[in-house]
Amino acid sequence: MRLNIFYILLIALCGLYGCKNHQQPIIKENLNILPTIYPEYQGALLPVNIAPLNFKIQDEGDEWMIQIQGKGNPITITAHDAVEIPIKRWRQLLHQNQGGSLSITVSSRKKGEWYQYSPFTWDVSTDSIDSHLAYRLIEPTYANWNSMAICQRELSSFKETEIISNKKSGQNCINCHTFNQGNPNEMDMHMRKINAGTILIQGGACQKLNTKTPHTISNFVYPDWHPSGKQIAFSTNLTQMSFYDAHPKIIEVYDTQSDIVLYDISKNEVYTSPLLANANKLENFPFFSPDGKQLYFCTCDR
């Protein structure tokens, strides 16, 4: 019996500490301006399953109170730096307000007094966002490329997982990954320098292609899949970098030569056209229309 009483008291104490009561401050003045936040989320339209829109307030203040209100129980947060929204309560609030809107009110404490900004809104869509976003994770400089990975993030949370890390491929350069209409079962990406080649994933099979031919400028570079999954358009480029003395981190990347080719997956053949490979032009960044009937690209004189 004593053991049961102990657990009851423990649960009660956890409940008291877990449900923090945010006392509403006495507002000295309404500022009648919007708070300066980063990222600039004011007026955003949110998919109903998006992860919490955490942000930083860039105005001056010693402490912040943020109230997110709509149908259902509001969320009240106090912060001194970044505003981190609890994910469970965020999901409940989005679900209750899909097709409606949320009002966000920010109050600032300065020298012991509270000031309130004008509220801004987030509209909540009834539509959901795709489950994942894939990207290359690399340090923000051209030099440190020996540590990188192709990653994916679950967009309903902040869970990040690796698709492939270059620690497993000889610390080479891995880049230019694309999917066919967002389908993770049809993917390509390039590996440079060590173990060089184009990795092609389709139909449960994975193969590495040597894509340089005597008739093309380079190995495959920037890709886009035909919606049928039967072909991929690639650019072939000779790329250079220029550096500025005025600022060491300003880099210009440009092509000295550039063509577009089409790769037939089933035949393992490459072909092109004078419209896509003109010696007097630079053709780049191919992109198929959603119905696959048009191929768009950038072109300019050399």
Language-model segments: residues:
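Short, conserved, GDST-rich strand-edge loop motifs in beta-rich repeat architectures
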Residues: S131-N144, F234-T256, C298-R302
